Amino acid sequence: MMSKPHHATLESIKYTPGSLRLLDQRKLPLETVFDDVLTVEDIWSAIKEMRVRGAPAIAVSAALGIAVATQRKAANGELKSGREVQTFLLTSCDFVMTSRPTAVNLFNCLRDLKAQVDKLDPTKAAAEVAQAFVELAEAVYTNDVAFNEGIMRHGAAHILAAAKAEGRDKVSILTICNTGALATSRYGTALGVVRQLFYDGKLERVYACETRPWNQGARLTVYECVQEDIPCTLICDGAASSLMLNRKIDAVVVGADRICQNGDTANKIGTYNLAVSAKFHGVKLYVAAPTTTLDVKTASGNHVEIEEREPTEITTNLVTKQRVVADGPHLSIWNPVFDITPSELITGGIITEKGVQAPAASAPYYDIASIIAQA
C-alpha cells in the first residue's frame, strides 16, 4: 500500500488569516522573494505577471487574495455593510478572472465562489460577510492540498503497477514545466506523482524538460527536486525524443491547465510535442490534474483560448534582461504559452484525486463528466 505523503515541501503560498504572501517565482532559483498581497489589484497583477503560476496555485491564490483584500476593506471601514461586501466580492471575482485566459481552475473556482457569495446574507455586518468569504476561500486551499495527496497516491500506484507487470520495480518519468509544490498548495500534480514514487523508494529518475521560454522546468522543477534530493536529470526541450529512443522511460506525466469534455488537454507549450513522440515510441502519457481542472462546458480543444504572451519572453534573457535575438523589419515572434494535446495521445490515462481513468479503445477516449460524477 502507498504511504500517505507527509514530507515537508516548498511553500509558494504563505497564508494566515488576514495575510497572504506569494513567492515571486520569476526570480527563482537565484532569489527567494515573497510579495505581500493587500488588494485585489495585487492578486490580479501577481497572476498576470506570472509571479504565481500553475493552474491550481492561481485559483487558490485568487481566492485567498480576494479574501484578504475584502477583510482589509471591511476592517478599515471602506466597506460599511454586508451588501457592500457582497458587491465588492462579486466584482472582484469578475476582475481577477480577466488576468489570464487559459487555465480553467481560476474560472471554476471564482464562478463557484460567486455562486456562494450570492447566497450570503447581505443584511449581516460587513465583517461577518467578509469572514464568511474568508472561510470559503480557506476551504479552496484545504481542498487543493487533499487533491494533491489523492493524485499522488493514485498516479504512483497505477504507474508502478504497470511497470511491475513488465518486470520493473522502479520507474523513470519524463515531465515538462513545473507541476509541483510551486504550482499548487502543497505537493503537486504530475510532480506530485513523481514525489510519491520517490517517497516510496520506487523512482529511478525524473527527467525534466527545461520548458522554454520561461524555463519552468530548469528553474522550478529542478529547484524542487534539488531541495528534496529527488534524482533528476535536466534536458533541453528538443532532447525529449532522443531520450525516449535511447533510454528506458516508463511514462510521461504532465499537468494540465484545462481538460475538455472529450479529454483534449491544454497544457504548457511543448506538451503536444511530447505526446506525439511518446505515441511514436510506445511510451504511455498521463495527464495529472485535480477535478477543478476538468471543463465539462468545453467540448474539445478546438474551443480553448490559447494565451499568447509578449515577444520579449523569447527574445530577451530572463536574467540580464538583454535582447539576445537579432531584430529586423521582417522578423515576427509567435509566443503561445499553451498547446492542445488531443485525447487520443493521452495513452496512459487521466489521473485525478478520484483515481485514474484509462482511455477507451476508440473515440471518445475520455468521459470527463463521469470522473466528476464519481463519489
UniProtKB/Swiss-Prot annotation:
Pathway: Amino-acid biosynthesis; L-methionine biosynthesis via salvage pathway; L-methionine from S-methyl-5-thio-alpha-D-ribose 1-phosphate: step 1/6
UniProt keyword annotations, A-Z: Amino-acid biosynthesis, Cytoplasm, Isomerase, Methionine biosynthesis, Nucleus
EC number: 5.3.1.23
A GO MF label: S-methyl-5-thioribose-1-phosphate isomerase activity
Compartments, as annotated in UniProt: Cytoplasm; Nucleus
Gene Ontology CC entries for this record: cytoplasm; nucleus
UniProt main location, coarse: cytoplasm
Pfam families in alphabetical order: IF-2B
Broad EC category: isomerase
Site (Transition state stabilizer): 177
InterPro entries, A to Z: IF-2B-related, IF-M1Pi, IF_2B-like_C, Initiation_fac_2B_a/b/d, M1Pi_N, NagB/RpiA_transferase-like
HAMAP family the UniProt entry points to: Salvage_MtnA
PANTHER family for this protein: METHYLTHIORIBOSE-1-PHOSPHATE ISOMERASE
Function according to Swiss-Prot or TrEMBL: Catalyzes the interconversion of methylthioribose-1-phosphate (MTR-1-P) into methylthioribulose-1-phosphate (MTRu-1-P).
Record-given protein name: Methylthioribose-1-phosphate isomerase
Organism listed in the record: Leishmania major
